[in-house]
Amino acid sequence: MMILSPEEIEVLKLSCKVAAVCLVFSLIPATLVAWVLARKEFWGKSLFETLVFLPLVLPPVVPGYLLLQLFGNRGLFGQYLAPFGLEFAFNWKGAVLASAVMGFPLLVQSIRLAIELVDQRLEMAAKTLGASSFGAFMQVTLPLASSGILVGSILCFCRSLGEFGATITFVGNIAGETRTLPLAMYSLMQQPDTEAAVWRLIILSLSVAFFALWFAQWFSRYQKNKRGYSA
């Protein structure tokens, strides 16, 4: 049985907290953006879409540095937020923001693909029966896209757990405050005689990611089978 040290347990708790808060604050905006990209046509859509997915192709250090310039204590926005207690640089809230920026495109893409697979005629039928656009979305689109939303949520959560470049650039590597799983592994690899601890964290990361992705695949198949039986 693998026994974690108190420091490793603290790292795991912090990583899960950062990933969970990131997902909670990303889910509604990502669903809205995904719906807009899936259902609406407007001038500048290609530019908007490019901006949404840009973090996927940028070196993670670039978004991290931009976040530091924007939300650092002396940043463009950070200097005005700091007096209200909203400080992001070099604390766990900044780690949430960095993870959200890097995981948001994955969440949007998964939800967008799920919404695009929903037959728009079902939405129109709901509206014909008296549902508003919002009601049709909540009662028809959202339930039918639930498997894609779950998969996207798990991908975003796992991406947050593995975020390194943007996090270390924006919030540093502070024990007990911003040191998540990948940062802890990086720190241990800089020290002698820590191979066993590194392997424990690697096995822990693999276990969490494997279980999360397995559950997403299982739930997706379950939903498909359920709809097949319903039909």
Feature annotation, model-predicted:
Residues 112-123, 127-128, 135, 195-231:
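C-terminal transmembrane helix and the adjacent membrane-cytosol boundary/short C-terminal tail
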Residues 1-24, 36-40, 187-196:
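Periplasmic/extracellular loop-to-transmembrane helix junction in inner-membrane transport proteins
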